[in-house]
């Protein structure tokens, strides 16, 4: 019976992660239904075990108590990943760009779409003066000013790759690592590591809450 209750607890933990939106911080949305089905299956299996062994009396083993405590902690303590730290420990790289990203008007491109465009057309002069309307988290760099960045995933945080844009931060701006910002402005041409690069010149910077789904495909 104890094993059945443990399965119910862990099944509810998985299902609650989907329903509460916590899973959006860890996994691409396309996989959420599969995870939700797994949680429902665990609950069903647990209830079945409880029903079949409802009259049996067994000593509750300490590993079961540890698992139950861990499941309870996961339910009580929401995940709070540091995207800036994760980005600093991951290689940069993006999947092949979608054609749509290149035909969108500049002000409609997301940060990731801008990065893909600039990698396919590395001459920053081609985008000089283009309007920019992006959002992302502040990614601290070992040297130089922080970037504005997003994480892209194929499946989950384990395969996340960062993509960032250089920003000409105003003198009175003090962006904090992991802070989410919405930036409006235009693309200009600057220099980074001795090479010409596209630089976002902000006309407006606004702190925003972390998006419901911060990971991009």
Whereabouts are the PLM-identified features?
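N-terminal amphipathic alpha-helix initiation
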Residues: 1-4, 169
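Membrane-embedded alpha-helical segments of integral membrane proteins
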Residues: 3-55, 59-60
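Domain-scale activation on soluble regions of proteins
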Residues: 21, 27-31, 41, 55-61, ...
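OB-fold single-stranded nucleic acid-binding module
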Residues: 22-26, 84-85, 91, 123, ...
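Bulky hydrophobic/aromatic packing residues
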Residues: 31-32, 112-115, 172-174, 187
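Internal/C-terminal transmembrane anchor helices
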Residues: 57-83
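Membrane-interface segments at or immediately adjacent to transmembrane helices
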Residues: 78-138
């Amino acid at each position: 019976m104890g094993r059945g209750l443990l399965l119910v607890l862990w099944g509810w933990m998985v299902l609650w992660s989907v329903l509460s939106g916590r899973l959006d911080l860890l996994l691409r949305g396309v996989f959420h239904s599969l995870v939700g089905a797994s949680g429902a299956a665990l609950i069903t299996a647990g209830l079945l075990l409880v029903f079949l062994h409802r009259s049996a009396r067994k000593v509750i083993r300490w590993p079961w108590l540890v698992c139950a405590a861990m499941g309870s902690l996961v339910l009580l303590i929401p995940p709070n990943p540091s995207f800036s730290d994760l980005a600093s420990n991951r290689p940069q790289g993006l999947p092949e760009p979608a054609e749509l990203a290149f035909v969108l008007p500049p002000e409609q491109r997301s940060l990731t779409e801008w990065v893909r465009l600039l990698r396919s057309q590395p001459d920053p002069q081609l985008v000089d003066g283009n309007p920019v309307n992006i959002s992302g988290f502040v990614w601290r760099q070992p040297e130089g000013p922080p970037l504005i960045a997003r994480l892209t995933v194929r499946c989950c945080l384990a395969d996340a790759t960062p993509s960032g844009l250089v920003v000409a931060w105003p003198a009175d701006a003090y962006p904090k690592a992991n802070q989410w910002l919405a930036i409006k402005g235009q693309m200009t041409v600057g220099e980074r590591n001795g090479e010409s690069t596209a630089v976002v010149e902000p006309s407006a910077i606004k702190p925003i809450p972390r998006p419901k789904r911060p990971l991009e495909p």
